[in-house]
Amino acid sequence: MSSQRRNYRFILVVTLFVLASLAVSGRLVYLQVHDHEFLADQGDLRSIRDLPIPVTRGMITDRNGEPLAVSTEVASIWCNPREMAAHLDEVPRLAGALHRPAAALLAQLQANPNKRFLYLERGLSPIEASEVMALGITGVHQIKEYKRFYPSSELTAQLIGLVNIDGRGQEGTELGFNDWLSGKDGVREVAINPRGSLVNSIKVLKTPKASQDVALSIDLRLQFIAYKALEKAVLKFGAHSGSAVLVNPKSGQILAMANFPSYNPNNRASFAPAFMRNRTLTDTFEPGSVIKPFSMSAALASGKFDENSQVSVAPGWMTIDGHTIHDVARRDVLTMTGVLINSSNIGMSKVALQIGPKPILEQLGRVGFGAPLSLGFPGENPGYLPFHEKWSNIATASMSFGYSLAVNTAELAQAYSVFANDGKLVPLSLLRDNPQNQVRQAMDPQIARRIRAMLQTVVEDPKGVVRARVPGYHVAGKSGTARKASGRGYADKSYRSLFVGMAPASDPQLVLAVMIDSPTRIGYFGGLVSAPTFSDIMAGSLRALAIPPDNLQDSPAVADRQHHG
């Protein structure tokens, strides 16, 4: 009897266990079939997720370590709309904290009901984000991000450029060196609690790659000097814009690259497309008379002319292939130095017609015109040199005094560095730590020194470009005034005013190119508009760099002449 009872109890226990197992299995099947979405949501809330490990974008500095672009930590607010679906009554409170209309926020949530990640506001300060998170609204979270800030604002805006909302370079140096600056974000695996908050970090799935800082060759002190001088000139002469490039001819490093007008990259409301491009590199133009020293160097190199060779320029005009060329002032006979002092189109044309187009074209190419500068800057326009299978006389003459070719302002600074550097062409660079290994002889050293001496006379002769002088220093340079093209011809009363020069002329340490676009008041000649701007920038830069003067005995006279004229 006792044996039967034991069997009965055993069968009962087994039966109950089987029934319980069937009940549990049935419930699981039911939940899988009928409550799959509910379980998915709950599993998601108690899930393992992958989150980015953001890398701080590299800093851009000037040559002395002054910050030009830095990233500051900010917070962005995001939500899981599926979590918030049951808490839409909280939208008015959330909208108030985000300073957004409640209706707009509600519409955003309802338009993305199935998303698990939706940005609500980006780039908030940590204090602003903490105020939002203090509301304790289910499904609302914050994430650490970085916002770009530009301490030098308008001074370097076109050079530095800017990033988009995701921190990727969009313009200027930010775009050109984006790979260096951005690094690579990592990825980490994290555990999320039922409220969707981070519980702990489990492991790193992808190690972040650190960003690199970029140290530019720019000197912020000199950039400020150039920018303020351009601002003064553009406002005084009612010009459309102004650009300047200051370089060290020995190293090729660009010390200032300025444009006016500019914009504030920290305030997107101030953005105007016309002011955002770096005009020193993107805008090309016919340079006019600042090309004459290169044509003259070809003439000296031909052996047919020297500094004292004479050419008749009377009666102040000449006709070539049916085209009439004029000089601004009537002269009878000029030396080659006199051709540069008086900026005679007739004299330069007659010289060019004697030596032919080939030596001039080759010389222009050797000093870098028509070729990219390879600065790593997006949007650079290298301009062009003319090419003809058969050169007409007017084509040769026009090229000799700066028409039928196109250059940018930075190219002018690089080309004039050849005169400053005894014929050596050192490619320009925007980086502080960028040793040059492509230096080449672009002009005979003797010819370069002779042209430099002629350009010094252009500035120091009483009939020369006196407004380009700098107290305490010998200056060598050339002005230019170029008519602006319009359709198939040239616009009336629309000019670009230029001056390119170097100092101290005895051993040039700085080369500066200045271009003022479309002056409308007082005058438009390069010697009137751009020469004094050159003087202001060069004088301030020489002082800032403590470059010793080489013309002390003439300082008071120069200062007096500049003050009165």
Swiss-Prot record:
Deleted gene: phenotype: Inactivation causes no changes in the cell morphology or growth rate of exponentially growing cells.
Recorded GO MF terms: penicillin binding; peptidoglycan glycosyltransferase activity; serine-type D-Ala-D-Ala carboxypeptidase activity
Keyword Cell division among UniProt keywords: yes
Entry-linked InterPro entries: Bact_Transpept/Beta-Lactamase (IPR050515), Beta-lactam/transpept-like (IPR012338), FtsI_transpept (IPR037532), PBP_dimer (IPR005311), PBP_dimer_sf (IPR036138), PCN-bd_Tpept (IPR001460)
Any one of the GO CC terms: plasma membrane
Enzyme class, first EC level, given as a word: hydrolase
Annotated Gene3D superfamilies: 1.10.150.770, 3.30.450.330, DD-peptidase/beta-lactamase superfamily, Penicillin-binding protein 2a (Domain 2)
Induction field: Produced in the stationary phase of growth.
Location of the active site: 289
Topology within the bilayer: Single-pass membrane protein
EC number: 3.4.16.4
Keywords from the UniProt entry: Carboxypeptidase, Cell cycle, Cell division, Cell inner membrane, Cell membrane, Cell shape, Cell wall biogenesis/degradation, Hydrolase, Membrane, Peptidoglycan synthesis, Protease, Septation, Transmembrane, Transmembrane helix
Pathway: Cell wall biogenesis; peptidoglycan biosynthesis
GO biological process: cell wall organization; division septum assembly; FtsZ-dependent cytokinesis; peptidoglycan biosynthetic process; proteolysis; regulation of cell shape
Transmembrane residue ranges: 10-30
The organism's place on the tree of life at top rank: Bacteria
Subcellular location: Cell inner membrane
PANTHER family linked to this entry: PEPTIDOGLYCAN D,D-TRANSPEPTIDASE (PTHR30627), PEPTIDOGLYCAN D,D-TRANSPEPTIDASE FTSI (PTHR30627:SF1)
Family: Belongs to the transpeptidase family. FtsI subfamily.
HAMAP family cross-referenced by the UniProt entry: FtsI_transpept
Function: Catalyzes cross-linking of the peptidoglycan cell wall at the division septum. Binds penicillin.
Record's protein name: Probable peptidoglycan D,D-transpeptidase PbpC
Taxonomic source organism: Pseudomonas aeruginosa (strain ATCC 15692 / DSM 22644 / CIP 104116 / JCM 14847 / LMG 12228 / 1C / PRS 101 / PAO1)
Gene giving rise to this polypeptide: pbpC
